[in-house]
């Protein structure tokens, strides 16, 4: 493994432990050349998952792209990086559980929209405003009212 500090290819594993319910191995490494310590993660390579975009083009599912969208939506909100990573994990697991190699970007967005209100309502509205591309204030208000209806129903249960 190349050291991110000195770029030498000689590191040793100091600590290794499973994370993410055993699906990922976290390894602490130390460069034998400069003694810089860094962390790597190993996960099983799975068949590529393609996302079909609105215009019909296909691109590989990108966890980082989804995480960046969540980070933007949750900016300056009390949402931890761990929570956002868990959302990405949950969405990817749901998609892979379908057993398909392709999924629409709409389905990916809907999976996120199903989880996000339980984490942070403001992040949900921000994500929805980009994902649903609100054209005007009326569409935005309709989304808010729908969310408030669901919240009220949840409170009554």
From Swiss-Prot:
Q: Does the keyword DNA-binding apply?
A: yes
The cofactors named for this UniProt entry are:
Zn(2+)
Q: Where is the ATP-cone domain?
A: 49-139
Gene Ontology biological process terms, A to Z: negative regulation of DNA-templated transcription
Q: Which UniProt keywords apply?
A: ATP-binding, DNA-binding, Metal-binding, Nucleotide-binding, Repressor, Transcription, Transcription regulation, Zinc, Zinc-finger
Domain of life of the source: Bacteria
Cofactor note, please?
Answer: Binds 1 zinc ion.
Give the HAMAP family listed for this entry: NrdR
**What's this protein's family per the entry?**
Belongs to the NrdR family.
Task of the protein? Negatively regulates transcription of bacterial ribonucleotide reductase nrd genes and operons by binding to NrdR-boxes.
What is the protein name stated in its UniProt record? Transcriptional repressor NrdR
Native source organism of the sequence: Latilactobacillus sakei subsp. sakei (strain 23K)
């Amino acid at each position: 493994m190349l050291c991110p500090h000195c770029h030498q290819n000689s590191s040793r594993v100091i600590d290794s432990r499973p994370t993410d319910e055993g699906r990922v191995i976290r390894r602490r490494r130390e460069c034998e050349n400069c003694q810089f310590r860094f962390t790597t993660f190993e996960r099983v390579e799975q068949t590529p998952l393609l996302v079909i975009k609105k215009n019909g083009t296909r691109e590989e599912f990108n966890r980082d792209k989804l995480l960046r969208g969540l980070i933007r939506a949750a900016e300056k909100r009390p949402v931890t990086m761990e929570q956002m990573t868990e959302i990405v994990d949950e969405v990817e697991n749901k998609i892979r559980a379908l057993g398909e190699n392709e999924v629409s970007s709409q389905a990916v967005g809907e999976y996120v929209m199903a989880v996000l209100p339980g984490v942070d309502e403001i992040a949900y509205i921000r994500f929805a405003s980009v994902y649903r591309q609100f054209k005007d204030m009326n569409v935005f208000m309709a989304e808010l009212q729908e969310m408030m209806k669901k919240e009220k129903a949840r409170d009554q249960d």
